[in-house]
From Swiss-Prot:
ZnF CCHC-type: positions: 1299-1316
Any one Gene Ontology molecular-function term assigned to this protein's record: microtubule binding
GO cellular component: cell cortex; centrosome; cytoplasmic microtubule; cytoplasmic vesicle membrane; macropinosome; microtubule; microtubule cytoskeleton; microtubule plus-end
Species lineage: Eukaryota, Metazoa, Chordata, Craniata, Vertebrata
Name listed for the protein in its UniProt record: CAP-Gly domain-containing linker protein 1
Subcellular location(s) per record: Cytoplasm; Cytoplasm, Cytoskeleton; Cytoplasmic vesicle membrane; Cell projection, Ruffle
Stretches with biased composition (Basic and acidic residues): 1096-1109
Membrane-topology annotation of the record: Peripheral membrane protein
Entry-annotated residues carrying Phosphoserine: S48, S146, S194, S196, S199, S203, S309, S311, S314, S347, S1116, S1246
Listed result of changing S313A: Phosphodeficient mutant which exhibits an open conformation with a high affinity for microtubules and DCTN1
Species in which this protein is naturally found: Rattus norvegicus (Rat)
Gene symbol of the encoding locus: Clip1
Broad class of the protein's primary localization: cytoplasm
Length: 1320
């Protein structure tokens, strides 16, 4: 039992077995032959029944057969732990199982040891299968009959057939032979497996080719799913099948090692080799009927079947009989000859007499031939009887010899069967080992796939770690910057605090000075200086007020600074905390990822080591098994060869004995033949006498037949003329149908042409769509340019406003004016550079427009040409349609005429047939009346006879005996005449009835022909209707094509309008640029006439800086656009060069393809020759003697040829793959050339160009060496802090007065709102 492995994978396909040499047995009895044929016939139906029963639901307790030969009861149904999928546990009748209901420590049911077995439900059947399926060959339904199997068939079928006349011997040897036949069939099956497996592999390959995307399949026999991918992959060589499973039992989501082959949910995708995948509802092999038929053919064509004929003499006699039968002239030929002669000579009595003479001659010839045939048949029958008696005697001796030989053969068979069983068991073990190795290889492949997935995951994780490290570095740089800023702010706060302290000290000193001054004033105050003191007091109060205001302002500024610094410090601290947390998280993630990586690497290494050890153990066990098998094979071959030699010597002796016996029998047969020939001559003489007597009676019948035949011939000639007319009409009808077929083919051609035109239209429409897309891209670019122009216009307006304000507020500073002039010159240079770049961009745009115009012109021309061609073809089609319609009408009228004529002819034939029948019926009635009259006359005569007898009795006394005798003789003569007339009438009646039967048959034939012609007419009518429908569909298609043409023309017009608009936009763009140059000139003139102004310098500088920034932005935008356009141009040039190279390579590839195809043909011829050699070698093997040296040499030759065939097949497969790849490349190149119309090299592969132009390039930083985060220009590591502080831009209105505190000396609040409460 071949159980599935725990991986749930399907067991590998059958491996080729070494062919065992078949025995040649002597002729056996006929009974085994009769039994082998039904067994072969019976091998067909069970295969289909089992295929149906795979789907059936089995039940627990149901009686089944495992593999068709192990009976038992189902005890368990369901899933198991040792392997996935549904399993059936069976309790067998005999202890030939594997377990007692438990596997790997888990019990599923209870039974006796070695009676339990687990198998798939598909291996169970409800009926006993044939012996070849029971031996484990139920998978090979479609194996061809190999030479070895033919040799086995000759062994079985070589017994001579017993004729039915001879009594057979007792049935003991027959029983022995019946028991021996299945053993021989087993031998032949084991021998033929090596060749039948080749055909099985071929059938599997066919099944693989029939796999398509979307098919329902089984992977490993258990995992069901849908095919989503078919082809070669990057992770492994060969053809792979990607399957989306119904359940999450897979390995991936359609992607392996970073490359995606199809899309599905995780754990639902699985990749497997094509030979491991089976299509649901598609049998991999053909049914077993082919094998049975092949065996029957071989049995029919074997040379042993020729030996069944008892002797060569019987064959010669049979050939003589066949020759005599073939030499007999036909009745129909004679009738035709006589009819032709009578047709020529109907008029006159002389013609009738000549015809009578000719008929008499014909009858004499026929009678002579009949005599010869009868003599030959009599000879043959007597000869056959004698030969059969001799054969019976020979068979008695032969049966004794056969019984002795069969006893010896039985002993040899038992020995051979034992050896074969051991071989079969060893081969099964070998197959199981090979299956295990294949399973291990498949698992290794799966592990390699999973390893590839793990490697991709590790690569992704490494990339993520790198990105995280880069982000860490970025965050660290940010943190450093923030710390530096904090330190700077702290230094600034310290300096400001020291300044505040100094100001406070100054205040204190000033207050002291004021107090001292007051004291001095009070002390030095004279009485007359009151006014001075008052003024001084007023000044002091004013100074004090100023001091208080300045103090309050200063306090406000200090508080605001403190608040600002506090908030800044809090912000910085928060940012630092967040950065620390992020760095901690990143470090933790990094550590976890590294641990995962280490763990995955360890697991991978463990798994690889495990599989390596398993593989090594499996290979070692496999090698041991192979060595043991080789040893056992060498021993078995030695013993078998000795036995075969002994058998051959015995068989040759028996053959010599048989030859002597046959020679003696032939000499006896020759002597008996001469005696038989003499007897036959005497018999012929007697027959001649009898024939002469019967000729007299035949002449009377001939006269009556002639008249009837003349009438019949006339009627037949009339019927023949009518039939000829009908045949002529049929021929006309057939010619009409042929014309219809030719029109249909022409219609199909036109339809094909239409399809081609549709494809051309589709190509043109795709090109138009591409042009539209290019136009939309150009429009988008033009829109961007318009937006930039709008920005420039706005900037120009701002500059004009600023210039107007500067003109109003101009001052006297000449130095500042010179500076401004210098800056303006610099700006002018930059503007000139921008203008140069713009001119270049405009030139590029004009070039693009020209290329677009050329493309559109080409498209329009091609469209117009296609439209013209389409219209011409349309006209041709319409003309053809009109002609077809005319032909159809004429054929329709001809059909109607033929129908009418046919109906008339049929009615006439019916009427004539009825008339002939009536005449014959009248004739029959007349003959019956005549018969009755003759019978009545006979009765009267009998009565007269009786009366005469009575009169004779009475007259005996009166008259003499002589008178009575005369009367009696007269009466007997009359009686014989009446009897002869009765027989004549009976014969004529029988002839008339036979003629009636022939007429009825002819009538039936004519009726059948009528029906056939009617059916033909109906079929022709149906074809005519189909033609009409096709014509209508073609008309509709033509209308659709014309609509499509008109739509395409409209779209072309629209495209032309859009081109015109784009050209108008370009001209407007050029006008705007001219206006800009004019405005720049005006600016220069305005700058020359600018007066100096000192107050507004700072504002002017700010405005100039703003202008600078906006101009720099516009310059950067234009430069980016220019670089993009340059890159696009370079790409286009590169693509053109690549396409030219590909075109050259395509030509070289085409030549390579041709050479490869020629090599392939040569290799295929070599393969065929080698296969023929293999077949011849195998035939020689099967028919050769038991010499071990010759056998070993032939085996080595067969193996070498097989290896050569395998090698050549692999070479052919590789060549086919290369050929397909090259063809694909050539097709791609030809499609690219077709898309470009073969004129413009830039137009090749426009689809790829569009895709490339549409695809945005991924962001990549050359500094950080990472994708998708940022560009090198936007990298934060290369961003530097500006040395000069930025200009303050308040964007307030110039008329408004900003609030200023004199105490704090800061903007933002007034002195009245300043806080005086703050302490310093």
């Amino acid at each position: 039992m071949s159980m599935l492995k725990p991986s749930g994978l399907k067991a590998p396909t059958k491996i080729l077995k070494p062919g065992s040499t078949a025995l040649k047995t002597p002729a056996a009895a006929a009974a085994p032959l009769e039994k082998t044929v039904p067994s072969e016939k019976a091998s067909g139906p069970p295969s289909s029944e089992t295929q149906e029963e795979f789907v059936d639901d089995f039940r627990v307790g149901e009686r089944v057969w495992v593999n068709g030969n192990k009976p038992g009861f189902i005890q368990f149904l369901g899933e198991t732990q040792f392997a996935p999928g549904q399993w059936a546990g069976i309790v067998l009748d005999e202890p030939i199982g594997k377990n007692d209901g438990s596997v790997a420590g888990v019990r599923y049911f209870q039974c006796e040891p070695l009676k339990g077995i687990f198998t798939r439900p598909s291996k169970l059947t409800r009926k006993v299968q044939a012996e070849d399926e029971a031996n484990g060959l139920q998978t090979a339904h479609a194996r061809a009959a190999s030479p070895l199997s033919t040799a086995a068939a000759t062994m079985v079928s070589s017994s001579p057939a017993t004729p039915s006349n001879i009594p057979q011997k007792p049935s003991q040897p027959v029983a022995k032979e019946t028991s021996a036949t299945p053993q021989i069939s087993n031998l032949t099956k084991t021998a033929s497996e090596s060749i039948s497996n080749l055909s099985e592999a071929g059938s599997v390959k066919k099944g693989e080719r029939e796999l398509k995307i979307g098919d329902r399949v089984l992977v490993g026999g258990t995992k069901a799913g849908v095919v989503r991918f078919l082809g070669e992959t990057d992770f492994a060589k060969g053809e792979w099948c990607g399957v989306e499973l119904d359940e999450p039992l897979g390995k991936n989501d359609g992607a392996v090692a970073g490359t995606r082959y199809f899309q599905c949910q995780p754990k639902y995708g699985l990749f497997a080799p094509v030979h491991k995948v089976t299509k649901i509802g598609f049998p991999s092999t053909t049914p077993a009927k082919a094998k049975a038929a092949a065996v029957r053919r071989v049995m029919a064509t074997t040379p042993a079947s020729l030996k069944r004929s008892p002797s060569a003499s019987s064959l010669s006699s049979m050939s003589s009989v066949a020759s005599s039968v073939s030499s007999k002239p036909s009745r129909t030929g004679l009738l035709t000859e006589t009819s032709s002669r009578y047709a020529r000579k109907i008029s006159g009595t002389t013609a009738l007499q000549e015809a009578l003479k000719e008929k008499q001659q014909h009858i004499e010839q026929l009678l002579a031939e009949r005599d010869l045939e009868r003599a030959e048949v009599a000879k043959a029958t007597s000869h056959v009887g004698e030969i059969e008696q001799e054969l019976a005697l020979a068979r008695d001796g032969h049966d004794q010899h056969v019984l002795e030989l069969e006893a010896k053969m039985d002993q040899l068979r038992t020995m051979v069967e034992a050896a074969d069983r051991e071989k079969v068991e060893l081969l099964n073990q070998l197959e199981e080992e090979k299956r295990k190795v294949e399973d291990l290889q498949f698992r290794v492949e799966e592990e390699s796939i999973t390893k590839g997935d793990l490697e991709t995951q590790t690569k992704l994780e490494h990339a993520r770690i790198k990105e995280l490290e880069q982000s860490l570095l970025f965050e660290k740089t940010k943190a450093d910057k923030l710390q530096r800023e904090l330190e700077d702010t702290r230094v600034a706060t310290v300096s400001e605090k020291s300044r505040i302290m100094e100001l406070e000290k100054d205040l204190a000193l000033r207050v002291q000075e004021v107090a001292e001054l007051r004291r001095r004033l009070e002390s030095s105050k004279p009485p007359g200086d009151v006014d001075m003191s008052l003024s001084l007091l007023q000044e002091i109060s004013a100074l004090q007020e100023k001091l208080e205001v300045t103090h309050t302002d200063h306090q406000n500024e200090v508080t605001s600074l403190k608040d600002h610094f506090g908030t800044r410090e809090e912000m910085f601290q928060k940012e630092i905390k967040a950065l620390h947390a992020a760095t901690e998280k990143l470090s933790k993630e990094n550590e976890s990822l590294r641990s995962k990586l280490d763990h995955a690497n360890k697991e991978n290494s463990d798994v690889i080591a495990l599989w390596k050890s398993k593989l090594e153990t499996a290979i070692a066990s496999h090698q041991q098994a192979m060595e043991e098998l080789k040893v056992s094979f060498s021993k078995g071959i030695g013993t078998d060869s000795a036995e075969f030699a002994e058998l051959k010597t015995q068989i040759e002796r028996l053959r010599l004995d048989y030859q002597h016996e046959i020679e003696s029998l032939q000499s006896k047969q020759d002597s008996e033949r001469s005696a038989h020939a003499k007897e036959m001559e005497s018999m012929k003489a007697k027959l001649m006498k009898i024939i002469k007597e019967k000729e007299d009676s035949l002449e009377a019948v001939k006269a009556r037949l002639d008249t009837a035949e003349d009438q019949h011939l006339v009627e037949m000639e009339e019927m023949l003329s009518k039939l000829q007319e009908a045949e002529i009409k049929k021929e006309k009808f057939a010619s009409a149908s042929e014309e219809a077929v030719s029109t249909q083919t022409s219609m199909q051609d036109t339809v094909n042409k239409l399809h081609q035109k549709e494809e051309q239209f589709n190509m043109l429409s795709s090109e138009l769509e591409k042009l539209r897309e290019n136009l939309t891209d150009m429009e988008a670019k033009f829109k961007e340019k318009d937006e930039r122009e709008d920005q420039l216009v706005k900037a120009k307006e701002k500059l004009e406003n600023d210039i107007a304000e500067i003109m109003k507020m101009s001052g006297d500073n000449s130095s500042q004016l010179t500076k401004m002039n210098d800056e303006l010159r610099l700006k002018e240079r930059s503007v000139e550079e921008l203008q140069l770049k713009l001119t270049k961009a405009n030139e590029n745009a004009s070039l693009l427009q020209k290329s677009i115009g050329e493309v559109t012109l080409k498209a329009e021309q091609s469209q117009q040409e296609a439209a013209k061609k389409h219209e011409e073809e349309k006209k041709e089609l319409e003309n053809k349609l009109l002609e077809l319609e005319k032909k159809m009408e004429t054929s329709h009228y001809q059909c109607q005429d033929l129908k009418a004529k046919y109906e008339k002819a049929s009615s006439e034939t019916k009427i004539k047939h009825e008339e002939i029948l009536q005449n014959f019926q009248k004739m029959l009635v007349d003959t019956e009346d005549k018969l009755k009259a003759a019978q009545e006359a006979n009765r009267d005569l009998m009565q007269d006879m009786e009366e005469l007898k009575s009169q004779a009795d009475k007259a005996k006394a009166a008259q003499t005996a002589e008178d009575a005798m005369q009367i009696m003789e007269q009466m007997t003569k009359e009686k014989t005449e009446t009897l002869a007339s009765l027989e004549d009438t009976k014969q004529t009646n029988a002839k008339l009835q036979s003629e009636l039967d022939t007429l009825k048959e002819n009538n039936l034939k004519t009726v059948e022909e009528l029906n056939k012609s009617k059916e033909l007419l109906n079929e022709e009518n149906q074809k005519m209707e189909e033609f009409k429908k096709e014509i209508e569909t073609l008309k509709q298609a033509a209308a659709q094509k014309s609509q499509q043409l008109s739509a395409l023309q409209e779209e072309n017009v629209k495209l032309a309008e859009e081109l015109g608009r784009t050209r108008d936009e370009v001209t407007s763009h050029q006008k705007l640029e001219e206006e800009r140059s004019v405005l720049n000139n005006q600016l220069l003139e305005m700058k020359k006439s600018l007066p100096s102004n000192t107050l507004r310098e700072s504002e002017y500088r700010k405005d100039a800086d703003e202008e600078k920034a906006s101009l720099q932005k516009s310059i950067s935008l234009t430069s980016a656009l220019l670089t993009e356009k340059d890159a696009e141009l370079e790409k286009l040039r590169n693509e053109v060069t690549v396409l030219r190279g590909e075109n050259a390579s395509a030509k070289s590839l085409h030549s390579v393809v041709q050479t490869l195809e020629s090599d392939k043909v040569k290799l295929e011829l070599k393969v065929k020759n080698l296969e023929l050699q293999l077949k011849e070698n195998k035939r020689q093997l099967s028919s050769s003697s038991g010499n071990t040296d010759v056998q070993t040499e032939e085996d080595e030759r067969a193996q070498e040829s097989q290896q050569m065939i395998d090698f050549l097949n692999s070479v052919i497969v590789d060549l086919q793959r290369k050929n397909q790849d090259l063809k694909m490349k050539v097709e791609m190149m030809s499609e690219a050339a077709l898309n470009g119309n073969g004129e413009d090299p830039n137009s090749y592969d426009s689809d790829d160009q569009e895709k490339q132009s549409k695809k945005k390039p991924r962001l990549f930083c050359d500094i950080c060496d990472c994708f998708d985060l940022h560009d090198t220009e936007d990298c934060p590591t290369q961003a530097q802090m500006s040395e000069d502080p930025p200009h303050s831009t308040h964007h307030g209105s110039r008329s408004e007065e900003r609030p200023y505190c004199e105490i704090c000396e800061m903007f933002g609040h007034w002195a009245t709102n300043c806080n005086d409460d703050e302490t310093f």
